[in-house]
């Protein structure tokens, strides 16, 4: 099978890159191994939330994105943002904002500065873009609603309203609020309660989206809110989009917000579903449940790849994009004596002091400190071309968290790296 572009990985980075290419006339295939990290994400995207700490002290929170992305080059020269340059990073981030609006992802935020989003535990976390159904505040501004009811679902343990309510008022932006907590009694979920493994956000949303007892649910929310102006709910209402939440908001006439629960995350799944629908509607091909095994090279180019399900058929393309993610998605593999990228056997880099063949450099002494192994990934140049055996391959690009040289957990930049590198690589391929 021959394509213009073959993309390995169907997560945020792979889908974003594929959509940008399909929109400009390229014929793309995505080899998708299974659920991506986006299915377990909060739904909020971070461009850069914290600056690195050289002494394992407190990481400084980022508010002004342009200023800090520019400063990042001095501290982490191998970070993808440092390689691309601040101007291109911000330009590609703005391109993604336009794409998100086009796809009706219902995201709020901008590259001007970060905002704070409320987490499922009641703390505040910096973010670049968040679903407009998630409660957010800008800087130290007070939350606009004074009376808040945090409502869980009886028997649902992946969202704890009492804990959230107690932690929420500790934040200066919510110290003026009166916060109560309670539980919704939804009889339609009784069947799910019999098996705790099935009582998850996805199962709940699938059961409720048929709106068989919509009026009863509206009545239960109004009564449980007890006169509150705003209601925080677990993200269990509406699997593919926010239409169900919008209908509830209109019917209750309350300021309803939803918060991410323990994974799987409905907020992240909605985004992946909408991105995939867009890609396929543009004529792209997604091969699900398959994984790339190895590649054949000709000089400094990739000629073809082989996959697990298509053993006897090579996938050839003019360009290849590695969007396979990090350890979670098996884009990187760790053995006792080495960390490696399994498909192309690309060169691996990390932060200063990390050696992918020296296990003693993989971890920090303190568990809570940033761990060097989390910065492992493939080496790239300013065009996001992948390095192998010291040479850059001219038709192989890497996007997202398979790239090394930065710790996405420490810096809060995983989503930003995914979409920025994805759109930058799309531009590189289209310019050929």
Swiss-Prot record:
Catalyzed reaction equations: a quinone + sn-glycerol 3-phosphate = dihydroxyacetone phosphate + a quinol
Name this protein carries in UniProt: Anaerobic glycerol-3-phosphate dehydrogenase subunit B
Lineage: Bacteria, Pseudomonadati, Pseudomonadota, Gammaproteobacteria, Pasteurellales
EC main group: oxidoreductase
GO biological process: glycerol catabolic process
Pathway: Polyol metabolism; glycerol degradation via glycerol kinase pathway; glycerone phosphate from sn-glycerol 3-phosphate (anaerobic route): step 1/1
GO-annotated molecular function: glycerol-3-phosphate dehydrogenase (quinone) activity
InterPro entries: FAD-dep_OxRdtase_2_FAD-bd (IPR003953), FAD-oxidoreductase_2 (IPR050315), FAD/NAD-bd_sf (IPR036188), G3P_DH_GlpB_su (IPR009158)
Family statement drawn from the similarity comment of this UniProt entry: Belongs to the anaerobic G-3-P dehydrogenase subunit B family.
Annotated Gene Ontology cellular component terms: glycerol-3-phosphate dehydrogenase (FAD) complex
Keywords, in A-Z order: Flavoprotein, FMN, Oxidoreductase
Organism: Haemophilus influenzae (strain ATCC 51907 / DSM 11121 / KW20 / Rd)
SUBUNIT field: Composed of a catalytic GlpA/B dimer and of membrane bound GlpC.
Cofactor: FMN
Classification via Gene3D superfamilies: FAD/NAD(P)-binding domain
Disulfide bonds: none
Enzyme Commission code(s) on record: 1.1.5.3
Summary of the function given for this chain in its UniProt record: Conversion of glycerol 3-phosphate to dihydroxyacetone. Uses fumarate or nitrate as electron acceptor.
Keyword Cytoplasm: no
Family annotation (HAMAP family): Glycerol3P_GlpB (MF_00753)
Superkingdom, natural source: Bacteria
């Amino acid at each position: 099978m021959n394509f213009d572009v073959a993309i390995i990985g169907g997560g945020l980075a792979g889908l974003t890159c594929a959509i940008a290419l399909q929109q400009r006339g390229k014929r793309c295939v995505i080899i998708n191994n299974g659920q991506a990290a986006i299915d377990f994400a909060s739904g909020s995207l971070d461009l850069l939330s914290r600056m690195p700490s050289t002494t394992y002290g407190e990481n400084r929170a980022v508010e002004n994105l342009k200023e800090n992305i520019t400063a990042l080059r001095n501290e982490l020269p191998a970070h993808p943002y440092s390689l691309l340059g601040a101007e291109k990073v911000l330009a590609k981030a703005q391109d993604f904002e336009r794409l998100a609006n086009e796809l009706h992802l219902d995201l709020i935020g901008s590259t001007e500065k970060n905002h704070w989003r409320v987490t499922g535990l009641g703390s505040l976390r910096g973010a670049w873009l968040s679903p407009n159904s998630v409660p957010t505040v800008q800087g130290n501004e007070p939350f606009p609603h004074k009376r808040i009811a945090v409502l869980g679902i009886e028997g649902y343990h992946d969202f704890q309203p009492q804990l959230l309510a107690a932690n929420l008022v500790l934040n200066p932006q919510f110290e003026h609020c009166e916060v109560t907590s309670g539980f919704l009694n939804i009889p339609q979920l009784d069947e799910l309660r019999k098996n705790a493994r099935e009582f998850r956000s996805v199962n709940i949303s699938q059961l409720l989206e048929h709106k068989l007892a919509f009026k009863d649910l509206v009545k239960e929310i109004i009564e449980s809110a007890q006169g509150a102006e705003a209601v925080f709910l677990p993200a269990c209402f509406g699997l593919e989009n926010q239409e169900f939440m919008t209908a509830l908001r209109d019917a209750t006439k309350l300021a309803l917000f939803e918060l991410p629960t323990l994974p799987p995350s409905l907020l992240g799944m909605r985004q992946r579903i909408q991105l995939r629908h867009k890609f396929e509607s543009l004529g792209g091909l997604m091969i699900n449940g398959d994984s790339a095994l190895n590649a054949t090279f000709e000089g400094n180019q990739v000629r073809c790849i082989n996959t697990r399900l298509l053993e006897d058929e090579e996938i050839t393309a003019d360009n290849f994009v590695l969007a396979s993610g990090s350890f979670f998605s098996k884009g990187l593999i760790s053995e006792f004596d080495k960390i490696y990228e399994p498909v192309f056997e690309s060169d691996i880099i990390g932060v200063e002091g990390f050696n992918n063949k020296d296990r003693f450099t993989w971890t920090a002494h303190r568990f809570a400190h940033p761990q060097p192994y989390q910065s492992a990934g493939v080496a790239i140049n300013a065009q996001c071309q992948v390095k192998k055996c010291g040479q850059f391959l001219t038709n192989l690009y890497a996007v997202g968290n398979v790239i090394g040289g930065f710790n996405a957990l420490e810096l809060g930049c995983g989503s930003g790296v995914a979409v920025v590198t994805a759109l930058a690589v799309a531009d590189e391929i289209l310019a050929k």
